[in-house]
């Protein structure tokens, strides 16, 4: 209703009188103050804080399986065509690994266009990243185009076994329908091969070296390829986590490499990294980044 008069239109169609877009803009968000200003003529006096509240930009959760992949893409200075989902947060600092986001499925069709328009010049330094549910929604036809029209491009499907962005809904790859009942499960690897992609491989995004190896190998091949980055969403109830990590202060030299992954479980206190054990899932991404082995199991 913030943008389009959806409920308002339905009310009017039912013959009901209602107040809507003649008072509220179709641009920007609604707020309590805006509603009060339009309905009673003045906004209520709010509480003024002496100190400004620090900003809290959106960030991928602690233990998010997408974090390791995006760190690897950023490390290798690749151009990344993103898509719509939790992984869109890969565009946010400090990862800042996503270069474009247009609409659902545009990553796959976009990289196909890149490959053709650049006549191969961008093939070894550009990838598309799309989620499992978004791929099922609108990425399949783009992949068919890549196979049929022979694009030398790599698509990375980030498979977290759920539709995380909108509240953990099931999708055709999970084996359950929206009611939670068992349903036919789409095999992503078999589907990609059936669409004409011969090079399909699966990696664990928690394994940074394996991710980097897979990406480099697929980018070096003159053929369309798919990498499936597979690990369940860290917020799924059935996912078992490792013990939280802790910082060995004797080994830590405050190089801040562990901060480059952008994990909300790690913060700096007096210039030293500190792990919040209530958030840490023990995924080990930060441990792999530390050259001094200063992050240990708690």
PLM regions: where:
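Terminal amphipathic helices with adjacent charged low-complexity linkers/tails
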Residues: 1-45, 243, 297-298
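Generic long, charged, amphipathic alpha-helical segments
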Residues: 116, 122-123, 245-254, 274
């Amino acid at each position: 209703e913030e943008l389009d008069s959806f409920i308002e239109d339905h009310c009017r169609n039912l013959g009901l009188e209602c107040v809507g877009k003649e008072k509220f803009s179709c641009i920007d968000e609604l707020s309590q103050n805006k509603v009060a200003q339009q309905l009673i003529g003045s906004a209520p006096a709010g509480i003024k804080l002496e100190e400004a509240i620090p900003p809290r930009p959106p960030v991928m959760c602690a233990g998010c399986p997408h974090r390791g992949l995006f760190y690897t893409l950023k490390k290798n200075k690749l151009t990344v065509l993103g898509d719509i989902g939790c992984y869109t947060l890969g565009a946010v600092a400090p990862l800042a690994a996503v270069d474009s986001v247009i609409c659902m499925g545009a990553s796959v069709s976009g990289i196909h266009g890149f490959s053709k328009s650049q006549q191969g010049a961008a093939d070894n330094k550009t990838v598309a990243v799309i989620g499992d549910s978004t791929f099922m929604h609108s990425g399949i036809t783009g992949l068919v185009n890549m196979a049929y029209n022979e694009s030398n491009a790599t698509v990375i499907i980030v498979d977290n076994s759920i539709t995380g962005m909108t509240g953990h809904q099931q999708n055709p790859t999970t084996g359950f329908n929206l009611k939670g009942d068992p349903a036919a499960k789409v095999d992503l690897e078999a589907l990609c091969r059936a669409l004409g992609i011969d090079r399909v491989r699966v990696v664990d995004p928690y394994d940074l070296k394996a991710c980097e190896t897979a990406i480099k190998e697929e980018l070096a091949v003159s053929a369309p390829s798919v990498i499936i980055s597979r690990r369940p969403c860290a917020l799924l109830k059935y996912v078992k986590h490792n013990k939280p990590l802790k910082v060995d202060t004797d080994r830590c030299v405050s190089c801040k490499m562990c901060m480059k992954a952008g994990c909300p479980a790690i913060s700096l206190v007096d210039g030293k990294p500190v792990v919040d054990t209530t958030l840490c899932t023990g995924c080990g991404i930060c441990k792999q980044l530390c050259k001094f082995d200063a992050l240990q199991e708690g």
